[in-house]
Amino acid sequence: MKGKYLLGILVILGALGYMVFGGLGRNLVYFLTPSEYLQDQARYQNRPVRLGGLVKPGTVQYDKDRLELRFVLTDGVAEVPVFHKGTPPGMFKEGQGVVVEGRFQEGVFQGTNLLVKHSETYQPPKEGWTPEEVRKLIEEAQ
């Protein structure tokens, strides 16, 4: 009788272990810089990754009608062209730190999600502040 319970527990633990670790491998998303990607391009082709760096000044092209954003992401050493379909976040700008989730396809990073790094400090508007004062505070924090 004890053998049946032990066998049942082992089967359940084995199934749980397979679901946790087997699923983890398929859903793992790597975080890379442009330099890391360029060192091992073949490994990351058509695999989901997060690419982090700075938006290179002078490279941002946004087509409002098609909602297509193109820019170059750099880590100061290497550069990678990025394509993102959709409206960029309000704080997106040249020289800004960003993380783009997506896949590399034919040398271009096809972004599906664009995250903008912003200041960690929060200062709520004080009572009586005008919208211009609030806007100035936000711009200074960036």
Curated annotation (Swiss-Prot):
Its main location: membrane. GO terms for biological process: cytochrome complex assembly. InterPro entries: CcmE, CcmE-like_sf, NA-bd_OB-fold. It is a single-pass type II membrane protein. Residues 1-2 are cytoplasmic. It is found in: Cell inner membrane. The keyword Cell inner membrane applies. The chain crosses the membrane at residues 3-23. Residues 24-142 are periplasmic. Pfam families: CcmE. Heme binds at residues 118, 122. One of its GO terms (molecular function) is metal ion binding. GO terms for cellular component: plasma membrane. Keywords: Cell inner membrane, Cell membrane, Cytochrome c-type biogenesis, Heme, Iron, Membrane, Metal-binding, Signal-anchor, Transmembrane, Transmembrane helix. Belongs to the CcmE/CycJ family. Heme chaperone required for the biogenesis of c-type cytochromes. Transiently binds heme delivered by CcmC and transfers the heme to apo-cytochromes in a process facilitated by CcmF and CcmH. This is Cytochrome c-type biogenesis protein CcmE. It comes from Thermus thermophilus (strain ATCC 27634 / DSM 579 / HB8). The gene is ccmE.
